[in-house]
Amino acid sequence: PPCPRSVKIELTARCNFNCSFCAPGYKLRDKRDMDWGFYRRLLKELKHQGVEEIGVFYLGESFLLPWLPEAIKAAKDEGFDYVFLTTNGSLCTPEKVDACMVAGLDSLKFSLNYADEEQFASVAQVKRGLFGDMVRNVKAARRIRDQGGYDCGLYGSYIRYDGQQGERMR
């Protein structure tokens, strides 16, 4: 069968949240990062097979990786026209976002699955204060993109959470 046009690569299996709606099997996996050499080899093979777009995320939080900007640049250098990323937003500081945009990130999506700080603390199962960090980081990303003149789409996604998703997924 032909290779898909777009592929997501999970650079890390680590996440700083513990969301109740996240895939239950995720919590059973080793929380490790992908080997850099393996990542580079994977990029070459995917490009050779005709993949056009690379997502540098899956279930883990890619902003935990110190080499995320280098991973984005490596994908662009390999010839991928579109490199995208989804984040929970809590760790994408202005400095990290700027580095990713400089590296060539084409799309940054924020997974904003919480209506307010209370729901955030309950669903993500982390400190309430991270909600404010997340909101500030979303606003900063737009400012950085606009001031730097970067061609990076900024998006948000939201799952309407009724409190039962976690139970239904078990």
Task: Enumerate the predicted regions with their spans.
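Internal catalytic or translocation cores that form aromatic/hydrophobic pockets or channels
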Residues: 107-110, 117, 156
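Short, electropositive alpha-helical surface patch
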Residues: 72-75, 112, 161-170
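Conserved strand-turn element in the central/C-terminal portion of the radical SAM core barrel
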Residues: 83, 87, 137-168
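Histidine-centered beta-alpha loop that forms part of the nucleotide-sugar donor binding/catalytic region
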Residues: 58, 87-89, 112-115, 159-161
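Conserved alpha-helical substructure of the radical SAM core
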Residues: 1-107, 122-126, 132, 136
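Active-site loop signature of alpha/beta-hydrolase-fold enzymes
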Residues: 17, 115-117
